[in-house]
């Protein structure tokens, strides 16, 4: 009780009575009005700046600020002090006592003018969006009302991010073109791209939208549920959303559908070979309808963000008969396209990435027919993308050494390894890397040619200039980690609470900071 009383007493203390100037002094405001100087108002203002900087002043620090401000006002030897001069005095006092608050005060003191400019920019952009549209992102249809609303909000969010998250140096680097901060309209809210662990979410059932979903018992239900999971979870992030090794995810549900169909035909007294053939045909049909359903859903149903999520699936390494059937059927559906008869064309989503292993897909190998289906699809549609697991480079090295597949997040972003026990570095020779269930918190691009030109123009070492911008990016990412770490698991329940992300079995009220340790942040 005593500590609370002392705290309340300190908050209510009037420093204006304790620290007074030598004479009666007035502060001249921007509108020309005058107000009697009272240092207590300074304490109130800097207290708000300290709060924005996530800190607070001690009683001694407040007294230091008061004494400094009153002394400087006395030194002016005037009866009226313009508000800009008063701001400079207060800022100088904060630099002496707590520099981090000085920056917060400096950034915020002209907030009225900044907000007028900011809202004017947002208004101009909103008018353009409402009557002309927006062509910045091909994934968003700016003709739709829901998308227009989302784009206007994004413009406001971008302005707020630039004003209150980026430092002066970072803003200048962006304006000069040396760095580019991707997705400024969304970075304050959530993460970028991911390899979502759909299998982990499905296993044993899960909760979505306050409704409990049992684990699917058939393939057609699995397709429906996975489609719902993908659209719901992808709406809570802004980057590419990948379902890795989808053939292996669907395989056990195809097995369940097959057993169910086989039992049905056996009950009808059908011959064993006919029952097996018909059961396989039923499963094939479920695969066809399921993949067609995904193509329609992912290309026509916009997310709650107002865009069509960049959804990717990878497949091709499953050797079981139903895993093979999954990959081949998916490629056939993409090759045939969607639309009116005689006017069908391939859709965009989900983007398909074929995982090629020369020991599985080469001539005479177990998955040669899967490879041929991929080649035929590529010849007609330019899909799928091909990712070699046994060639050269980082992805192949991880596959050869650990047997782990590094699927792309979206189209081109690959996760660096995170080891089960060692974290960033393997604990020993038996430590295994984890990729599925991990994500990236944001990307910042470097303009290397411009940095080289700057180094030459200023006769400086290229790496010295490069290090300056790399350090800017590092500090930006560090602040992003700290900021996102304060978010609650309720912001993306499927990822943080139902197992979509690595370690994602938090309570809704838990902070997500523990999950960020395996997340990456990218300079491109």
Language-model region placement:
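Charged, amphipathic alpha-helical regulatory modules used
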Residues: 2-130
């Amino acid at each position: 009780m005593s500590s609370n009383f002392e705290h309340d007493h300190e908050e209510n203390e009037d420093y204006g009575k304790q620290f007074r100037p030598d004479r009666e002094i007035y502060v001249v405001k921007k509108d020309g009005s005058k107000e009697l100087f009272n240092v207590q108002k300074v304490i109130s203002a800097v207290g708000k700046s300290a709060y924005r900087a996530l800190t607070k002043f001690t009683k001694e620090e407040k007294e230091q600020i008061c004494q400094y401000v009153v002394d400087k006002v006395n030194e002016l030897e005037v009866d009226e002090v313009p508000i800009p001069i008063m701001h400079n005095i207060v800022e100088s006092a904060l630099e002496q006592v707590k520099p981090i608050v000085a920056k917060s005060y400096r950034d915020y003191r002209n907030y009225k003018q900044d907000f007028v400019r900011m809202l004017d920019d947002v208004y101009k952009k909103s008018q353009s969006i409402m009557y002309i549209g927006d062509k910045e992102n091909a994934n968003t249809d700016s003709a739709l009302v829901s998308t227009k609303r989302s784009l206007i909000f994004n413009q406001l969010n971008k302005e707020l991010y630039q004003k209150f998250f980026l430092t002066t140096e970072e803003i200048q680097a962006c304006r000069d073109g040396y760095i580019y901060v991707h997705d400024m309209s969304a970075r304050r809210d959530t993460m970028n791209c991911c390899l979502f662990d759909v299998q982990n979410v499905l296993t044993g059932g899960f909760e979505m939208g306050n409704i409990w979903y049992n684990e699917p018992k058939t393939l057609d239900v699995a397709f429906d549920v996975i489609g719902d999971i993908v659209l719901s979870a992808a709406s809570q992030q802004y980057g590419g959303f990948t379902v890795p090794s989808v053939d292996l995810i669907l395989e056990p549900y195809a097995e369940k559908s097959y057993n169910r169909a086989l039992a049905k035909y056996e009950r009808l007294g059908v011959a064993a070979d006919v029952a097996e053939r018909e059961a396989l045909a039923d499963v094939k049909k479920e695969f066809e309808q399921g993949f067609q359903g995904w193509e329609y859903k992912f290309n026509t149903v916009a997310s709650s963000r107002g865009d069509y999520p960049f959804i990717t699936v990878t497949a091709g390494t499953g050797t079981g008969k139903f895993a093979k059937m999954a990959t081949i059927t998916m490629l056939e559906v993409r090759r045939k396209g969607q639309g009116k008869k005689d006017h069908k064309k391939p859709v965009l989503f989900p983007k398909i990435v074929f995982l090629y292993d020369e020991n599985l897909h080469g001539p005479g190998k177990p998955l040669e027919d899967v490879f041929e289906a991929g080649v035929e699809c590529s010849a007609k549609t330019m899909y799928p993308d091909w990712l070699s697991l046994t060639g050269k480079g980082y992805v192949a090295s991880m596959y050869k050494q650990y047997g782990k597949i590094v699927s792309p997040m979206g189209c081109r972003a690959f996760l660096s390894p995170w080891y089960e026990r060692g974290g960033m570095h393997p604990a020993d020779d038996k430590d295994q890397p984890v990729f599925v269930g991990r994500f990236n918190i944001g990307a910042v691009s470097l303009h290397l040619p411009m940095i080289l030109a700057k180094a030459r123009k200023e006769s400086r070492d290229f790496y010295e200039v490069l290090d300056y911008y790399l350090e800017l990016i590092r500090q930006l990412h560090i602040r992003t980690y700290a900021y996102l770490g304060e978010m609650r698991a309720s912001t993306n329940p499927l990822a943080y609470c139902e197992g979509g992300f690595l370690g994602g079995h938090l309570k809704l009220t838990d902070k997500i900071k523990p999950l960020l340790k395996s997340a990456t942040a990218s300079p491109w």
